[in-house]
Amino acid sequence: MSEKATEIANLLSPTVDSLGVELLGVEYLPAPGGATLRLYIDVPLAEQPERVINVDDCERVSREVSAQLDVEDPISGHYTLEVSSPGVDRPLFTLEQFARHAGESTKIVLKLAQDGRRRFQGEILRIDAEAGAVVFAIDGKDVQIGFDNIDKARILPDWVALGLAPQKPNKPGPKKTGHEKKKPSNESAAGKPRAE
């Protein structure tokens, strides 16, 4: 998260927690016409998977947070507040969230290039808390990336496991079942014309 997003997350986290949900992270996206402030919320880990975030949770958080932002006013100018569940391509904001999703595939965007790249895709192997880093399996190698250098990270959904894998389209044309009737022919089985 950016410094501004971290500041806002620290400000709003107690309010969100008091509503029985967890603030996963904040995205602050400034733009010339007005910024977007996006909050990602989820149910506490102890209540998963029995309970999931629904529209009512998002509306409740939006109302309470909006009132707090009006009083605290941490953002100058116009902005749009969005409150969302993490979705299947869940964003990751903290080392604890990376640890919770060890073994899952992720897309990572770095602030500064590492090995000549800023974008990676790999499996979360483990957290190196001492180094403040996440270790990924990328292209068959273990790659350690400093947490402070991670700009964005999202889980890559396993569409097959979710039962949502795209189906291969059928080839156009007539389908053959192997039980088609043969048309009568003027030829015998040997391929010679029949005598009439």
Curated annotation (Swiss-Prot):
<dbReference type="Pfam" id="PF02576">
    <property type="entry name" value="RimP_N"/>
</dbReference>
<dbReference type="InterPro" id="IPR028989">
    <property type="entry name" value="RimP_N"/>
</dbReference>
<dbReference type="GO" id="GO:0005829">
    <property type="term" value="C:cytosol"/>
</dbReference>
<comment type="function">
    <text>Required for maturation of 30S ribosomal subunits.</text>
</comment>
<dbReference type="GO" id="GO:0000028">
    <property type="term" value="P:ribosomal small subunit assembly"/>
</dbReference>
<dbReference type="InterPro" id="IPR036847">
    <property type="entry name" value="RimP_C_sf"/>
</dbReference>
<dbReference type="GO" id="GO:0006412">
    <property type="term" value="P:translation"/>
</dbReference>
<keyword id="KW-0963">Cytoplasm</keyword>
<dbReference type="InterPro" id="IPR035956">
    <property type="entry name" value="RimP_N_sf"/>
</dbReference>
<keyword id="KW-0690">Ribosome biogenesis</keyword>
<comment type="similarity">
    <text>Belongs to the RimP family.</text>
</comment>
<feature type="region of interest" description="Disordered">
    <location>
        <begin position="164"/>
        <end position="196"/>
    </location>
</feature>
<dbReference type="InterPro" id="IPR003728">
    <property type="entry name" value="Ribosome_maturation_RimP"/>
</dbReference>
<feature type="compositionally biased region" description="Basic residues">
    <location>
        <begin position="173"/>
        <end position="182"/>
    </location>
</feature>
<dbReference type="InterPro" id="IPR028998">
    <property type="entry name" value="RimP_C"/>
</dbReference>
<protein>
    <recommendedName>
        <fullName>Ribosome maturation factor RimP</fullName>
    </recommendedName>
</protein>
<dbReference type="Pfam" id="PF17384">
    <property type="entry name" value="DUF150_C"/>
</dbReference>
